A protein has these predicted regions:
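Zinc-dependent deaminase catalytic domain
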Residues: 1-180
Length: 180
């Protein structure tokens, strides 16, 4: 029997990596976040946090505050940003893509406002990489979960898959691996 020398990423790792790549498009220096909406193991839409399409980026307007400790702190400051989850849902809507019954992968646990939007768009499962301190809104999040409206699960990349992804990003991909 041939020994398996190639480990494929799990579906969760695969879609989380796509969300992480989407986050690289963010101009938010405080919280670069990416999201990908998936149904039947197919990507429906991606999103990242930033200003609405066609609008100037926060960084180009001098409204970027990378020292913020939370998204809530931006309420006192002029934030132009649309959250990654909302952006992905908007992209799906703009292109007539149904999100009912879909799954979303996000690099940061959704805030309560995005969670309400996710639920309203018919997305039933949320996979996130990093926890978000939702403060006093955690009870509302937990109520949505208890009511069966949505499920949340924290996921991460294994070290092996993260290293493999870094190699793929740094080296030419479509060449024979045997010659390396």
């Amino acid at each position: 029997m041939r020994e398996q020398i190639y480990q494929r990423p799990s579906w969760d790792e695969y879609f989380l990596m796509i969300a992480k790549l989407a986050a690289t498009r963010s101009t938010c220096l405080a919280f670069p976040v990416g999201a990908v909406i998936v149904k039947d193991k197919q990507v429906l839409a991606t999103g990242y946090n930033g200003p609405p399409s066609g609008s100037n980026h926060c960084t180009s307007q001098g409204f970027c505050y990378p020292e913020l400790s939370s998204c809530d702190a931006s309420k006192a400051l002029p934030s132009r940003s649309v959250h990654a989850e909302a952006n992905a849902i908007a992209q799906a809507a703009k292109h007539g893509i149904c999100t009912n019954g879909a799954i979303i992968y996000v690099t940061l646990e959704p805030c309560i406002y995005c969670l309400k939007l996710i639920i309203s768009s018919g997305i039933k499962e949320v996979f996130y990489e990093t926890s978000f301190n939702s403060g006093g809104k955690a009870a509302l999040r937990d109520l949505f979960i208890q009511d069966g409206l949505v499920s949340l699960k924290q996921v991460s990349l294994s070290d092996t898959i993260a290293k493999k992804a870094a190699t793929f990003l740094l080296d030419p991909t479509s060449i024979s691996k045997v010659s390396r």
